[in-house]
Amino acid sequence: MATEQEAEVGTETSSVSGRFLRNRDLYLFLPFLLGFSDQESSNGDDDDVASSRERIILVNPFTQGMIVLEGSSGMNPLLRSLLESREEGRPPASKASIDAMPIVEIDGCEGECVICLEEWKSEETVKEMPCKHRFHGGCIEKWLGFHGSCPVCRYEMPVDGDEIGKKRNDGNEIWVRFSFNDGRRIRDFSAQDGGNSDGVESEN
């Protein structure tokens, strides 16, 4: 049975993630950073309690692991500074360019997929980008679906013209999809002001 603290963490995860993530680019520049909790307390006048409840939530979107850290007074300004100083990144790669990547077989078992950090298996089939860097098919397809460049060398994949326009018009929208072990899935968060936790749903 989940403890009161675990339930509280789950609630904070769903409520702050939509407000913290601002766009697809930030999600990729900081792939393990999902969000941090607001400095709120139940009575509104106890600053010590509010500070003690501040948490930073780290998520690996590929392994679906989550770590909750207690925040510090210096972390909040640092993270907000990263948000404000970010530069626009490249839009998602076109579906045609992703589908066109060849499937190759790994000769040996040395090395790893730099996205999920899993080691290659002997005779495993992977996808190879035009820059010759190789990744698990599922990993690189997810990556390029958010950001159209190689995660190793930043080789730029072709993008759709309408995706560029859509990105400029929908700069405040972020789509996130991952699941926790309890069967709940957080997805399709909108970073518009006034967003709520409607993106949390139960899986059957």
From Swiss-Prot:
One of its GO terms (cellular component) is cytoplasm. Induction: Induced by arsenite and the proline toxic analog azetidine-2-carboxylate. GO terms for biological process: cellular response to hypoxia; cellular response to misfolded protein; cytoplasm protein quality control by the ubiquitin-proteasome system; protein autoubiquitination; protein polyubiquitination; regulation of protein complex stability. Autoubiquitinated. PROSITE patterns: ZF_RING_2. Its EC number is 2.3.2.27. Keywords: Cytoplasm, Metal-binding, Stress response, Transferase, Ubl conjugation, Ubl conjugation pathway, Zinc, Zinc-finger. InterPro entries: Znf_RING, Znf_RING/FYVE/PHD. This is E3 ubiquitin-protein ligase MPSR1. It comes from Arabidopsis thaliana (Mouse-ear cress).
